[in-house]
């Protein structure tokens, strides 16, 4: 019931952002990031497209062709790498007019940036070991239950992953976190 109340409240708090009003430490945050289903080995291009469509919906001017997952895939895909290299994700976002920061992230980094309305591209290793690397978009957190919500281009929108499982999958990629904010956004 509390979740339903919080979801309804999100409509009145700020478009696409959910947080409990005065005591946000008790609830969490959820960003309404559009979901894009990936093609085979297309998690990187789908993740970029989700991120760009989110920022476009929040007032950033982005050419439609730059937000098209298929066009991104054709431009960046590496046959050798069976996907898109992180450095190519970063370059593409810079070329599209974003300030880009690739970090070795921590749980608190997720909380900080999601609370500020900034979705994040993360690299995980589903299952935690020996699976192919996979990009997802972090879209929210449940602070009470210590869980992260992701748009997983292979599995669906707003998937909830418990912290222990998530950190195992994320640590397998050395906690790769990609923060991309419009160049026109104020620096914080």
Label each PLM-derived region with a short phrase.
Residues 61-67, 78-87, 98-105, 137-140, ...:
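Short, exposed beta-strand "edge-strand" segments with a Pro/Gly-rich flavor and a Y/T-containing core
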Residues 21-22, 91-94, 169:
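Short, conserved catalytic or adaptor-binding loops enriched in Gly and charged residues
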Residues 2, 20, 79-81, 115, ...:
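Noncatalytic regulatory segments and standalone regulatory/sensor domains
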Residues 2-6, 10-81, 126-129, 144, ...:
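Active-site-adjacent structural segments surrounding the nucleophilic cysteine of cysteine proteases
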Residues 39, 44-51, 68, 72, ...:
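Stable alpha-helical elements in mature extracytoplasmic
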Residues 72-120:
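Mid-length scaffold segments of soluble, non-membrane domains
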Residues 99-151:
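Active-site-adjacent substructure of cysteine-protease-like catalytic cores
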């Amino acid at each position: 019931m509390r979740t339903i109340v919080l979801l309804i409240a999100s409509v009145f708090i700020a478009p696409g952002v959910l947080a409990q009003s005065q005591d946000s430490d008790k609830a969490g945050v959820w960003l309404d990031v559009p979901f894009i289903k990936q093609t085979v080995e297309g998690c990187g291009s789908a993740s970029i497209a989700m991120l760009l469509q989110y920022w476009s919906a929040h007032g950033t001017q982005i050419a439609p062709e730059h937000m098209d997952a298929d066009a991104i895939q054709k431009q960046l895909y590496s046959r050798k790498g069976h996907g898109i290299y992180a450095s190519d994700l970063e370059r593409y976002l810079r070329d599209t007019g974003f300030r880009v920061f690739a970090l070795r992230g921590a749980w608190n980094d997720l909380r900080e940036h999601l609370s500020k309305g900034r979705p994040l591209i993360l690299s995980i290793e589903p299952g935690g070991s020996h699976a192919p690397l996979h990009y997802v978009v972090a879209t929210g957190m449940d602070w009470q239950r210590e869980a992260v919500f992701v748009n997983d281009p292979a599995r669906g929108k707003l998937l909830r992953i418990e912290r222990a499982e998530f950190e195992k999958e994320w640590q397998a990629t050395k906690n790769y976190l990609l923060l991309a904010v419009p160049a026109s956004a104020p620096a914080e």
